[in-house]
């Protein structure tokens, strides 16, 4: 795909950051790059990731209108893949491949709890993007053949949970939890057995489930990382999920923290023509607050492409499958 785009005149800048932009009469004039280059343009699609905190801060300081947005936080849980297979298929057979699942629950106080980014036969990884923070994520290799299945189990948080009304308060909310996770694991991923999590007690030894984690981990107490309402929501949800998947609520289930990058805590405001308050600066995708995963981000990208194509061709264009 890269070579095709380059053959049509496109250019890729690797290891290069957009550090600034200039305007004239509130219209985009140029973007500045970390390599010192300045590119004159009147259209820039701001398709940043949901962890691009430096860019959030830069555009906020430049006067781009932004607002708080709900997202979800929680933990990664690990179970033996064989147990998931037996629950989903009725038996375990390698020819069927590693089974997956999708789970949802609503707490008594109205918060949603759900599985997210489930990784069959996968690994938990440290995905921190800032110093002295810990962020967990999941991944599977193509064979999906590790011993464990893992998934995020997260609960919804809203701007009412954030420390202030500042548009970037959700980012600070994330950052605080990620620093707590780093401290709880002494710089490693903090893990805990589900039984110990419920008893608010630091794990001292593993049970019958061994973690599949890329990188170092340390025993900890995730109650020291997450707000009480999140811990309660997850604990209740794990009991409910046992009705769907036998063994999901096993005392030896491995939990790791903190899963805090489910989606963007910020939305960059755009109008009906996809424009920010600087004309030509077009927020798009998950980091901009208009998607909640790969598929919805791709759909938003298609809408932006069709809009920009109309500008250049003066006619409607459509993406066809």
Residue ranges: model-predicted function:
Residues 1-321:
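Residues forming the flavin
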